[in-house]
Amino acid sequence: METRKEIIKQMGDEMREDIFLEVNNRIERSLRRRFWLRISAVAASVTLLFGISNYISFHEGYKKLNSQMIEMVNPMGMRSSVVLSDGTKVILNAGTTLSYPAAFVSGQREVKVNGEAFFEVSHDKEHPFIVSAENVKVKVLGTKFNVKAYDDDDNIEVTLAEGKVGVGLDTKNLIQIMPGQQIKYMKASHRFIKREVRLQSYTAWVCGKFYFTNYPLEKIAKQLERSFNVRIQILGDDLRKAAFTGDFVRGENIDQILRVMTANRPIRYEIEGDQITISKTLLSKEIFP
């Protein structure tokens, strides 16, 4: 039978062991707490850095997205329109390419056009709107105007419908025009001509119409080629230079237009698919008697 001393000693050993285990557990819990606090701090730092990195990347991507140029190509035989990020509406004629940013940034509003386009520019006094057509610049604040600048044309024409625009080879030295006026830039001589025009003759295409006033046939043929996606061959220099006047409304096809143009004139035309040939009648010596 155990003596009192042995029992007391055994209890003391057990108490010391319990006390040791408790102290050890507390130390381990403290160490674990410190460890997880450090891990949490590191994780928080990584999360913060990741968040900042994502924020920077997002905004860099946003700028890249907004500065990215969009090229809109309108095929032959069609008209189309687009509304830019500032609210400006652009109507594209057949065979026209418009280059513009996804969104205007840094206060710059500039687009490029190759072909023909009618602009309805959203007014912004602080940020002028600039159209580049080859080496010609058109600068406006808010207005309606037409730009015709096809690669195969000899001239670039800017015709004003409303407001006021400036036209030049840069954005500083500009020629100002008023509604009903046109600036014609002659590519060969690098000269500008300012003149009064019949506005409908240069903007009717927006509504699908044609207004020709003493237009040479070769110029009319180019418009018809683009609008109807056909090829027109004119036989004879005198016929190419012959002037025509006429108005044609929406819905008339190429055959109807040519029929009206050649009526009561010593001219005939033949249509084979998308190929059209215009020539003088065999017995005619002059285009117009």
What kind of region is each of these model predictions?
Residues M1-L31:
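Disordered, charged N-terminal biogenesis/targeting segments of membrane/secreted proteins
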Residues L21, N25-I27, W36-V42, L49-P289:
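A residue-level detector for the "anchor" residue at the start of short, highly conserved motifs
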